[in-house]
């Protein structure tokens, strides 16, 4: 189930994004990005609709994933 990020408290959203960034360990290429830059990049992607917040009822977890992947059914078991 997609969770509307706009309805979350800003501090809660920041914590969710930070947790995701730290958990994912995303590679940003040759130049290393700070945590703040990575968080801002994910926030930008949420605002543009590139990624969505997804709640898994099965696992009772929240994840951030590309909208295309969610729409294609790649969200299972989310």
Curated annotation (Swiss-Prot):
Family membership, please give it: Belongs to the UPF0270 family.
Residues folding into a coiled coil are: none
Q: Specify one Pfam family.
A: UPF0270
Top-level taxonomic group: Bacteria
Q: Kindly provide the name given to this protein in its UniProt entry.
A: UPF0270 protein PC1_3850
Bilayer-crossing residues are: none
């Amino acid at each position: 189930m997609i969770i509307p990020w706009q309805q979350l408290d800003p501090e809660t959203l920041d914590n969710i994004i930070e947790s995701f960034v730290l958990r994912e360990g995303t590679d940003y290429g040759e130049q290393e990005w700070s945590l703040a830059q990575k968080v801002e990049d994910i926030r930008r992607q949420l605002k543009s609709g590139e990624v969505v917040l997804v709640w898994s009822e099965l696992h009772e977890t929240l994840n951030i994933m590309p909208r295309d992947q969610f729409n294609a059914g790649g969200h299972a078991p989310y």
